[in-house]
UniProtKB/Swiss-Prot annotation:
Positions of transmembrane segments: 787-807
Domain of life assignment: Eukaryota
Source organism (scientific name): Arabidopsis thaliana
Name of the featured protein: Receptor-like protein 48
Family statement drawn from the similarity comment of this UniProt entry: Belongs to the RLP family.
Length: 813
């Protein structure tokens, strides 16, 4: 028999075993919290998209690739569940490399307990389905920087718990104020704004929304941030925005005596079509920290700038490019002691030499303000980080004290009349833009010591000498533009930095070869070496730069073939290809353009490169530019044109053989110039597939055969030139072709028909036959008319004789 102590020991052991088993069971349950229906919905959602990096500038994590069946979905990357119910409540897939549309029957909408849905910075395309309204517990929703378009679904207005809505940087549209003919009918967007009574944060910026804001916005009583900038909204700001219930003010409007309990702290309404006076009611929003009213159309009226003096909490104020004739004293804004960012671009400014400004200001943008002297007050702006005084009328040298400001990093002094040698820049400089001035001398080697330099733009000055060899030491530079100076010599062999995205050295006197070390610049998008003396073969190695979008080699001394069996070209993102006015030779194979997908029908489906990377730096204040031949004239393409303008120019070379049939797959092409070569054969009928083509130049070649009548289907084709070839036959009668000047068909002896005066042979025979037939018909008609005349005379004669005899008989009786 067991003793009592042994029995107690056994009891303890069994109790411990039981506790251990129960705890394991509980841990097992806790470990596998995910519900099967939630797991299935997530896995189906994963399979609705394919995962692939789509933008070299925006790194993404392939989060959904780690999701596996038969594992706890609540422990998956970017997924959060309610610990009590096992329902998925948060899905954060921002920058997760997702590509594809969001379908209306997506399994996402089965996750009906979602409270937070973050899908921004993905390549999610198509229309945002109404099914989004099924997620009725959503508190936060973000599709920022996707590829969504169409109308914002009205079902968003049913999300009564929603506090954060971000649909910015898409292509959403909305009805205009008169699109339905009923000005009293609320649009879907207006209904959404009226129903989101719990929302604190709304960001609809950078879309294509238009129309007017709803007249009654007082229901948005909890609004903290409201961003509708960079759209096409019109009309005026509804007064209800300044009358939300929490506002409280009394007494006369004097500086400092307005009090408000409004939650509204961020209001971005810039870059729309708002018009009329800026409402004085803005002064009631004394809690505002950020305010943007840029590009407001006051109708050249006078702006009452005293409105802004009440906004003592302002940290950021953007009043750039107001359409006003008002001149304002910059000292007007010196009372805003919390101001960190101020943009008054496009406003006529008066700046006193004794001006004292808040030293806390970090960003100051005074572009196009008619400033004639370098502002002296800047010497005391010890916190200045970003300075833009471009497009003014400032002459002389840049004062040396500017470079002693300890935090200065971004400087834009372009489009002035600064002269002298380039100043010695401080190590803090990250971006220096000094284009379109009168700087001269050599580029100083001290520039190479700027270890943080990302952007250097010295275009359109009078610099001479060679590109410093020490440029090879750059490690961080991304944009280097030395365009239109008098630089000579050869490129540094190890150019420039592997981080380079944009290089423009066009319109100089550079010689030698294009440095093959550029092959290391895997992020290079923009390469322009036009109008130099570069003597080299075609750089086939550029094909390895998969991000290259603009390639301009025109007006140099490049030579040799542009096709090689060993080095076939494939430019998946190329938008502009200009190799004109060189000495290229050889034949192009039929499939030469097969790999140029950015100009084909699949263009840009997964290309989300933000314009800022193509256009320039820091909010787009600098823009790339190239000179292209379009419709027979040279034109400068600047800024956003790069994103939509697709052109191929191989003119002025010695290319021969047939025009490649594969040219017909480049359906996004807008300009095609193959003139002044030695192309032979027929004009390929596949050109009729270029449905976006606006300009076509095939002149000065040796083309034969007829002009394909199918070209008449190209409704956007405004200009074409077939002159100086060996074409023959009738000129097609399509309107697009017949509207051209006769010079577009000159020196083709075999061409005939309008707009030429000479008729085609068949046309002359047809006209003679038609004329003879008309003469025969006229003669036959004349004979018939004579017969009818005799019959009519006979008909009239018989009754006349009868009546005459009858009357005579009566009279004699």
């Amino acid at each position: 028999m067991h003793s009592c102590s042994e029995r107690r020991m056994m009891t303890v052991i069994w109790s411990l075993c039981l506790i251990f088993c129960l705890s394991n069971s509980i841990l097992a349950i806790a470990k596998d919290l995910c519900l099967p229906d939630q797991r299935d919905a997530l896995l189906e959602f994963k399979n609705e998209f394919y995962v692939q990096e789509f933008d070299p500038h925006m790194k993404c994590e392939k989060a959904t690739e780690t999701w596996r069946n038969k594992t706890d979905c609540c422990s998956w990357n970017r997924v959060s569940c309610d610990p009590k119910t096992g329902k998925v409540v948060e899905l954060d897939l921002m920058s997760s490399c997702l590509n594809g549309p969001l379908r209306s029957n997506s399994s996402l909408f089965r996750l009906q307990h979602l409270q937070s849905l973050e899908l921004s910075s993905n390549n999610i395309s198509g229309i945002l389905p109404d099914s989004i309204g099924n997620l009725k517990y959503l508190r936060s929703l973000s599709f920022r920087t996707c590829h969504l378009f169409g109308k914002i679904p009205s079902s968003l207005g049913s999300l009564s718990y929603l506090t954060h809505l971000d649909l910015s940087y898409n292509d959403f549209t909305s009805e205009g104020p008169d699109s339905g003919g009923n000005l009293n009918r609320l649009t879907d967007l207006q209904l959404v704004l009226l129903n989101l009574s719990s929302v604190t944060w709304i960001d609809l910026g950078s879309n294509q929304l238009k129309g007017m804001l709803p007249s009654n916005m007082s229901s948005l009583s909890k609004l903290v941030s409201f961003d509708i900038s960079e759209n096409s909204f019109s009309g005026s700001i509804p007064s209800s925005l300044f009358m939300i219930p929490s506002l409280n003010f009394s007494g006369p409007l004097e500086i400092g005596n307005i009090s408000s309990h409004s939650e509204l702290g961020y209001l971005y309404m810039g870059e729309n079509n708002f018009n009329g006076p800026i409402p004085g009611s803005l002064s009631k929003l004394v809690g505002l920290r950020d305010l943007s009213l840029s590009f407001w159309n006051t109708g050249r009226g006078i702006v009452d700038f005293s409105i802004f003096l009440h906004l003592k909490s302002l940290c950021s104020l953007d009043l750039s490019y107001l359409n006003t004739r008002s001149m304002v004293d910059l000292s007007f804004f010196s009372h805003l002691m919390s101001l960190d960012e101020l943009d008054l671009s496009g406003i006529n400014l008066k700046i006193s030499s004794t001006l004292s400004f808040p030293s806390a200001t970090g960003t100051l943008i005074l572009a196009s303000c008619n400033i004639v002297e370098f502002p002296k007050f800047l010497e005391n702006q010890t916190s200045l980080f970003y300075l833009d005084i471009s497009a003014n009328h400032i002459e002389g040298q840049v004062p040396e004290w500017l470079w002693r400001l300890p935090t200065l990093s971004f400087v834009n002094i372009a489009q002035n009349s600064f002269s002298g040698e380039l100043p010695m820049l401080p190590n803090s400089i990250y971006s220096f833009i000094a284009s379109d001035n009168q700087f001269s001398g050599e580029i100083p080697r001290t520039v190479c010591e700027l270890v943080s330099l990302n952007t250097l733009v010295l275009s359109n000055n009078k610099f001479s000498g060679s590109i410093p060899r020490c440029f090879e030491n750059f490690k961080t530079i991304s944009i280097l533009h030395l365009r239109n100076n008098s630089l000579s010599g050869v490129f540094p062999k190890e150019i420039i930095s592997e981080t380079l995205t944009s290089l423009d050295v066009g319109h100089n006197w550079l010689s030698g070869q294009l440095p093959k070390s550029l092959i290391k610049c895997t992020d290079l998008e923009f390469l322009n070496v036009e109008d130099n003396r570069i003597n080299d073969k075609f750089p086939f190695w550029l094909r390895s730069l998969s991000n290259l979008q603009i390639l301009v080699l025109r007006s140099n001394e490049f030579y040799g073939p542009i096709f090689s069996l060993e080095d076939s070209l494939s430019f998946p993102k190329l938008r502009i290809f200009d190799i004109s006015e060189n000495h290229f030779t050889g034949v192009l194979p039929s499939d030469y353009f097969a790999g140029w997908s950015a100009m084909s029908s699949v263009v840009d489906i997964f290309d989300t490169t933000p314009q800022v990377h193509i256009l320039g730096v820091f909010q787009g204040y600098y823009h790339n530019s190239v000179v292209l031949t379009n419709k027979g004239l040279n034109m400068e393409l600047v800024g956003s044109g790069f994103t939509i303008y697709k052109t191929i120019d191989v003119s002025g070379n010695r290319l021969e053989g047939d025009i490649p049939e594969s040219i017909g797959i480049l359906k996004e092409l807008i300009v095609l110039n193959m003139s002044n070569n030695a192309f032979t054969g027929h004009i390929p009928p596949s050109l009729s597939n270029l449905s976006n083509l606006q300009s076509l130049d095939l002149s000065q070649n040796r083309l034969s055969g007829s002009i394909p009548p199918e070209l008449g289907k190209l409704t956007f084709l405004e200009w074409m030139n077939f002159s100086y070839n060996r074409l023959e036959g009738p000129i097609p009668q399509a309107t697009q072709i017949q509207s051209q000047n006769s010079s577009s068909f000159a020196e083709n002896p075999g061409l005939c028909g309008a707009p030429f005066l000479n008729k085609c042979g068949g046309e002359e025979e047809e006209e003679e036959e038609a004329t003879k037939q008309e003469e025969d018909e006229d003669e036959e008609k004349e004979e018939k008319n004579q017969v009818f005349s005799w019959i009519a005379a006979a008909i009239g004669y018989v009754p006349g004789v009868f009546c005459g005899l009858t009357i005579a008989h009566i009279l004699t009786s």
